[in-house]
Amino acid sequence: MVSVEDIINLQLSKEEIIECIRKTQSVVFLDNLRKRHPNVQFDCKLRGYIGELAIKKWFLSNGIEIEATDYLPDGDSIDIDFIIAGSNIELKTSLMPDVDINIEGVLNKRDIKLIRRNGQSVEKLKGDIHMQIYYQQKTKAKDKWLSKQEVDLYSSDMDYLYTSLKAYAYLSTTFFVAWIDKNTIVKRINSLPVHKRCWSFPNSLREFWVCPLKSSNKPRELINYFKELLFIQGSVDTNHRNMSTYLE
């Protein structure tokens, strides 16, 4: 179970956010789910890269190195996958629903966003580990504000973009809330009645697997998970080398 005290606030600097703005400018993909204002699309991509940078910093500060990163355009957002200790980690980043007062409200009501693709079974879910970041910023209110702004998204003036898009809001509103491993989610979903396994937004083209944040895993437990996995892999590798030397 995850409590509000377990949630980790991932702090970023202005320079780091500007780095993410620059990265967002360099990537273009189409919003194939709904026609959204360019500013909103830009912000969707931006928060994906901000989440990536924030999580990488957090892993490194805890002695965990990321082996590889992959980016997959996904409608109006971007999926970011990491490889750590041979495990595939999928990172999801979301703004909070407007009805949620704060990050505690998100914890009590929301899920890790696990997309059910093309009606597939939960066994087909990609990724070994699924992490969920929520930004303490309200979705509809932010989208409405962004849609009213006149911003040159291709400006070379990073300070202008940082201010015009209110990117400074990401300095302290990035929260790593929870994570879950695939084996656990498969067992949980299969234990539920079929009609209670998925949920969706009104008028949405997507389904999500039921995965409440509160009953998922605490952020800090992910560090222990990978350290144990790396230790086991290191022990196996050492034993393999020792055996190879013996056989020589």
Predicted regions, residues:
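Active-site beta-strand termini and strand-to-loop segments that position acidic
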Residues: F82-G86
